[in-house]
Amino acid sequence: TGTFRLADLVGMDTAVHVINGMRQNCPDDEQVAALEVPKFLTFLTDNKFYGNKSGQGFYKKTGEKDPKGRPVVLALNLETLEYTQSQKEKLPVLDTLKQIDELPRRIKAVFKADDKGAQLLQRSFLGLFAYVSNRVPEISDTLYAVDDALRAGFAWEAGPFQYWDMAGVAECVERAEKQGEKIGSWVKEMLQAGHTSFYKIENGIRKYYDLRSKSYQPLPGGASFILLDNYRSNKPVYTNAECTLHDIGDGVLCLEFHSKMNAIGEGILRGINDSIQIAEEQGWKGMVIGNNAQNFTVGANLMMIAMMAYQQEWDELNQAVNIFQQTSMRIRYSSIPVVIATQGYVFGGGCEFSMHADAVVAAAESYIGLVEVGVGIIPGGGGTKEFAVRLSDEITKEGDVQIPRLIDKFKSIATAQVATSAYEAFNFGYLLPQKDQVVHNTARNISEAKAKVLELADDYVMPIQRKDVYVLGRTGLGALYIAAHSLKLGHYASEHDIKIAKKVAYVLCGGDLTSPQTVSEQYLLDIEREMFLSLCGEQKTLERIQFMLENGKPLRN
């Protein structure tokens, strides 16, 4: 939330109290001493325009809508103190930053740009850097505690000293002083002693600059975390354009994705298969699949699927889907334990991989789901098959409890349910209590996954592919078709949604079988792939894929 929008949320009266309270309680703070209630804020409080709670503040809703159906919102002109039509400012730096995934590269790009948006960001960052340099050791003896507090308390991706490292400490000191900022003397002493950063990695150990000893010290508790940046200086066990295999110690490997948004393409599929083969042939104890990015993965590379579907390259698409399925099966049926560590988005193929792993260590803030229906297809990397397998393990061959459980599984896929936390993922069937676990500190998920690999490695026996999957055939299909049509009658689904839902139902029930019976996993994978390919030939599916690629949100057609 931006500064003025946040003020509307908090309330102008509260903002004034905060300013006055800070001036009273922090008299020696050079920034607080300069704080004054601006004219426009006095205007708002005098007129009791407190923000959201009074109906208007810096912004004012009119109740009207523009030609595109969006609410018309007026903004306060800070000079005239009148409300005018708010307009989005065109800032080239934002267009540049949207193209960059890695946070360090984004910060460097901010300081290289020269438009007014970049200048605002630069002034803000330099002011922040100067301020925190003067608060250490006043409020904390260690700089990492300041970073930790702002990351934990305000959900920042990095703390101010970490941002400063990304931008370049010496360069920012020079620019800040030109801007009129006063930098803490200890920072200059650090630079003069030849120490050019606040943090560094030495022999795989992350260290911070300690003011007391004027040297680098290991971060406390660092052994509890596995940060893959700490292994960058080591030669990788394996690498390609989309993933890298690291030796994280104790005979355990970690495969890290680094494609754009960690989307699963040919490189990641090949990397998973090659990495498992390396682990098996070279005698490693097991493998973690995980990364320290904001999101584990957004799922399959949709552009790759779209190109083959538009060009009607059905043999190539069939082969690509088959490779995806066999990669999921390779994760499950290898001679070493494979544990997946997740955080952030775990969509589509990422969810399918996790369902096939020996175990999942999910950060509490993992948003897990099979979202393929939103782009007009079904989960085709083994996810629909795996739901049929899990249903088989839950139900008995007798009793009416079968159909309600079947409908629950069906709804998870057909309505593209995304768990809003790792705990909710258990309710949707994406995680299983007997094998998966949740960690509250996202930074611990890879280290916990490594511990799980070591726990499983002793006496690990490669599973045998299932040929005893109990499916309901026509008995289940009838119930699911009724459930699908009830969604349409309730205006929750379109005709194309129903077509997709019926394909999901077909796989979950093992096809149009005359009676309930047992089938093999490969049988289910074959019909899953058949249903996936049939939907790729639908015009409405192609429209959904194109709309998602162009707009980043699903089309309901």
Question: Where are the model-predicted features located?
Answer:
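N-terminal glycine-rich phosphate-binding loop for ADP-containing cofactors
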Residues: 1-294, 303-323, 327-336, 343-347, ...
